[in-house]
């Protein structure tokens, strides 16, 4: 255990000088004596000086304080003891429920599974959300991104997915809150508690008010816990809200470390940092990790380097659109922009595939006709186009659905719709079985039977 002393402090970046023969390795954890602060080595500057990033507040630190090298990377508790607990980036409990009592700790920097260890699969994961199951179905052991700008419903969608999948899935889940609102973390905890699934979820929070070091590493902390469950042969769910804040923390750290910025001011190592995280989120022959990641899209621009880098790693992308949210259709998923590798007749079957493509065709055609309708009105359309527009408007409304986690706001009970009912409903609308029903009947209902019942009351 070698010791050094602080020689410079610039915000969250601290330079520590060690004797030249015992300079700590990159990613080693250092402890500041007399303070609770942990530092992580990022660079070796030469002459025994290392540049570190603080995993916590640097208030009260000063030059000359003694720092001890722990000789290992940051390690966090793993295993069953973490379930039902809220932890910070270092694995310390922050739920005031006593120590974690873990049997094992694991370093947060682990190599990704080798190519030979990885396993693929084509099993579908039913979510109970119509638009997702129809147009961008999830794969078990796959990676899903929820893309959206500010305030279009990423967190609500994620909470609904967690509720539906965790309730039905009955396996273990890990939730990593990366640079999000503390209020949402609190809501999430109570939501899990009320749904009686808290004893199957490990929660790791590094919220908006934390220093950049915490936000940069908290995703790795959550992932390390998920990897342990996977290696024990479980199918794990990993939820990350929000992966963009992980990138942003990397940008802040990169600037503080004095690296040259790249496009739009992002860190030059953006693709590598994203790859290091994403390559570890994978299924092996022991068990699977299915991950759902919320991705904030700055200024609704999907070509921004951060969301664009994330796209490459995902199996399914759920794009939330402000235009659809402005119509009052929630979940505001854009069925034309959202994609999935599972949308293949060999995987999901012909009926599902044809229905999904039929829905997309009708909505795309309606989008093209909107300009004509705006200029000339509906009367100028051919009879076929009038019929298509009527069906498109019904489909658009039928893609909406009341959520369980939003009952408090909407006042209407949540609905879980099975994949079979989803396909039956949409294929019925496409065939014209429900042309006689008013379009309002399709808004905010679960299955097609509820739409028929609602039509009787209109």
Swiss-Prot record:
One of its GO terms (molecular function) is ATP binding. It is found in: Cell inner membrane. Coiled coil: none annotated. GO terms for cellular component: plasma membrane; proton-transporting ATP synthase complex. The gene is atpD. This is ATP synthase subunit beta. Produces ATP from ADP in the presence of a proton gradient across the membrane. The catalytic sites are hosted primarily by the beta subunits. F-type ATPases have 2 components, CF(1) - the catalytic core - and CF(0) - the membrane proton channel. CF(1) has five subunits: alpha(3), beta(3), gamma(1), delta(1), epsilon(1). CF(0) has three main subunits: a(1), b(2) and c(9-12). The alpha and beta chains form an alternating ring which encloses part of the gamma chain. CF(1) is attached to CF(0) by a central stalk formed by the gamma and epsilon chains, while a peripheral stalk is formed by the delta and b chains. Belongs to the ATPase alpha/beta chains family. The lineage of its organism: Bacteria, Pseudomonadati, Pseudomonadota, Gammaproteobacteria, Pseudomonadales. SMART domains: AAA.
